[in-house]
């Protein structure tokens, strides 16, 4: 257990925040039978989905704004401390294998850096300047997008990052789990996931964390759909970087162009592992270079590329 630092000053009283309030359903939490404990958590975990649904309009606005910037060469950054920051890092890390995106395209910036993935970063989240400095260190610029994640909406590290994004003309998106009037944040788009008081008072890794993960899943996936990395419901830009993903790539080829595994493997070898390229090559009878040129003309969008060539894939 970390020792107490007697010089550390408390923050302003945060008891008014929705995420810090006591949940009346859990006031006897330590007295409940195990089955009742589990059932209570299950019941409360319905709320994150409702909170995300209530924020759908703001999330959609963020998707469109981010997609526009990324299409013009911008990048997406998640910034946060503790659970919020770790969730951003997790979502960013999943983009390259799922969508074959450049690791620079979606980045997670966590207060305290990589060590804070495993251990808390005491003190760093309390500094607005640290948020600015970390973004600057990552080369954050005007054409980029920032999602600043802070469950309680008061984290100085995140506030500093959002202020910096606003000051340079980057897209600033706030994501918090308290009402705007309790913790206003500098931003262009404000996403509020109002999950209510936690069963364990103040432990925002619970409902707030769940809602945040859901919102980030939706945000990154729908942005990638807009960028043309999906055809139907298939991840046609999947990076075949392990045995499981090679198998998934082969099944996508089988389902969309009817090739069996041996021919699928040969197509992947010809297309340098690109499922999207392999699909267009086979469906339109093109060489790799020809297919690549068509995709480039259509901003890597498979559907219009197929239409240009008069080719079709199987109906899903």
Swiss-Prot record:
Q: What class of enzyme is it?
A: lyase
UniProt GO BP: amino sugar catabolic process; N-acetylmuramic acid catabolic process; peptidoglycan turnover
Signal sequence residues:
none
Task: Report which superkingdom the organism of origin falls in.
Answer: Bacteria
Please list the residues that make up the active site.
94 (proton donor), 125
SUPFAM superfamilies in the cross-refs: SIS domain
Q: Where is the SIS domain?
A: 66-229
Which PROSITE patterns would you find in this protein's record?
A: GCKR, SIS
Can you name one GO molecular function term for this protein? carbohydrate derivative binding
Key words, A-Z: Carbohydrate metabolism, Lyase
So what EC number does this one have?
4.2.1.126
Q: What catalytic activity is recorded? A: N-acetyl-D-muramate 6-phosphate + H2O = N-acetyl-D-glucosamine 6-phosphate + (R)-lactate
Which pathway does it take part in? Amino-sugar metabolism; N-acetylmuramate degradation
Q: Where is this region: Disordered?
A: 1-23
Q: Does the keyword Lyase apply?
A: yes
Q: What else is known?
A: A lyase-type mechanism (elimination/hydration) is suggested for the cleavage of the lactyl ether bond of MurNAc 6-phosphate, with the formation of an alpha,beta-unsaturated aldehyde intermediate with (E)-stereochemistry, followed by the syn addition of water to give product.
Assembly and binders: Homodimer.
Query: What is the protein named?
Result: N-acetylmuramic acid 6-phosphate etherase
Gene name of the record: murQ
């Amino acid at each position: 257990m970390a020792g107490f630092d007697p010089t550390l000053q408390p923050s302003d009283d945060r008891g008014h925040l929705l995420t810090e309030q006591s949940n009346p359903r859990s006031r006897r939490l330590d007295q409940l039978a195990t089955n009742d404990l589990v059932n209570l958590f299950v019941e409360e975990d319905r709320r994150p989905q409702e909170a995300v649904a209530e924020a759908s309009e703001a999330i959609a606005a963020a998707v469109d704004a981010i997609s526009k910037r990324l299409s013009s060469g911008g990048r997406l950054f998640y910034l946060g401390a503790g659970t919020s920051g770790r969730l951003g890092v997790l979502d960013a890390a999943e983009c390259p294998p799922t969508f074959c995106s450049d690791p620079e395209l979606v980045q997670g910036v966590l207060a305290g850096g990589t060590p804070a993935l495993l251990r808390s970063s005491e003190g760093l989240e309390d500094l607005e300047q640290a948020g600015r400095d970390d973004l600057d260190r990552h080369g954050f610029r005007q054409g980029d997008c920032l999602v600043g994640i802070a469950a309680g909406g008061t984290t100085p590290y995140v506030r500093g990052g959002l202020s910096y994004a606003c000051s340079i003309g980057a897209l600033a998106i706030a994501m918090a789990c308290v009402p705007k009037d309790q913790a206003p944040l500098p931003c262009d788009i404000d996403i509020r996931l109002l999950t209510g008081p936690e069963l364990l008072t103040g432990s925002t890794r619970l409902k707030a964390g769940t809602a945040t993960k859901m919102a980030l899943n939706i945000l990154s996936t729908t942005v990638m759909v807009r960028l043309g990395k999906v055809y139907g419901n298939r991840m046609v830009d999947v990076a075949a970087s392990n045995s499981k993903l090679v198998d998934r790539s082969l099944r996508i080829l089988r389902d969309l162009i009817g090739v069996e595994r041996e021919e699928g493997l040969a197509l992947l070898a010809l297309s340098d592992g690109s499922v999207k390229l392999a699909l267009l090559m086979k469906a339109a009878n093109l060489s790799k270079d020809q297919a690549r040129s068509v995709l480039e003309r259509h901003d890597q969008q498979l559907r219009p590329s197929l239409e240009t060539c008069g080719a079709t894939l199987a109906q899903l």
